Amino acid sequence: MSATETKYVPRLYKKYKEEVVPILQKKFNYKSPMQIPRLQKIVVNMGVGEAVQDIRQLERAVEDLRAITGQQPVITRARKSEAGFKLRKGMPIGCKVTLRKERMWDFLDKLISVALPRVKDFKGLSPRSFDGRGNYAFGIAEQIVFPEIDYDKVDRIRGMDIIINTTAETDEEAFWLLSLLGLPIRSM
């Protein structure tokens, strides 16, 4: 890479480094910069229960998830058999993507600025969705809130779970980190 070329830096990562880090450092009195919470990964999971009867449903879900995240999803399989759901161990039942680095920051930016504002009757994310270890999980009921999904080509509405994994020690630290990044979480 020559001196004139600039490396791509995601907009939200730049905001994290320039604005969020100093605020968190001051608020929680961290001694070392390595103590400051940061994002580790974002996992986007789409459970497709209909895949048991119709495998094409899973293929369409994989296509949707690939379009939304820009990364090839991995198919998740049943861990154990469940007669009530006509499910056998090893059957495909969903797909997921683990995003890290630039793709993670780009996805979070798109989620905050485009997808969540398009959710009907959206009043902010619940502050109760923290897990006690600084991670945050929530669900989106419709994949059509993402701009990559063509509304006319959607065969059925599918939801997804989004898990944001941080290095924060407590829920309060994670709340401040995600709120300062712009995630619309209702106050605790």
From Swiss-Prot:
Pfam families: Ribosomal_L5, Ribosomal_L5_C
Key word Transcription present: no
Record keywords: Ribonucleoprotein, Ribosomal protein, RNA-binding, rRNA-binding, tRNA-binding
InterPro entries tied to this protein: Ribosomal_uL5 (IPR002132), Ribosomal_uL5_bac-type (IPR020930), Ribosomal_uL5_C (IPR031309), Ribosomal_uL5_CS (IPR020929), Ribosomal_uL5_dom_sf (IPR022803), Ribosomal_uL5_N (IPR031310)
Keyword Amino-acid biosynthesis: no
One example GO MF annotation: rRNA binding
GO cellular component entries: cytosolic large ribosomal subunit
GO biological process, one term: translation
Similarity remark: Belongs to the universal ribosomal protein uL5 family.
Function: This is one of the proteins that bind and probably mediate the attachment of the 5S RNA into the large ribosomal subunit, where it forms part of the central protuberance. In the 70S ribosome it contacts protein S13 of the 30S subunit (bridge B1b), connecting the 2 subunits; this bridge is implicated in subunit movement. Contacts the P site tRNA; the 5S rRNA and some of its associated proteins might help stabilize positioning of ribosome-bound tRNAs.
Xref: PANTHER family: 60S RIBOSOMAL PROTEIN L11-RELATED (PTHR11994)
Subunit structure: Part of the 50S ribosomal subunit; part of the 5S rRNA/L5/L18/L25 subcomplex. Contacts the 5S rRNA and the P site tRNA. Forms a bridge to the 30S subunit in the 70S ribosome.
Name of this protein: Large ribosomal subunit protein uL5
Species of origin: Aquifex aeolicus (strain VF5)
Gene: rplE
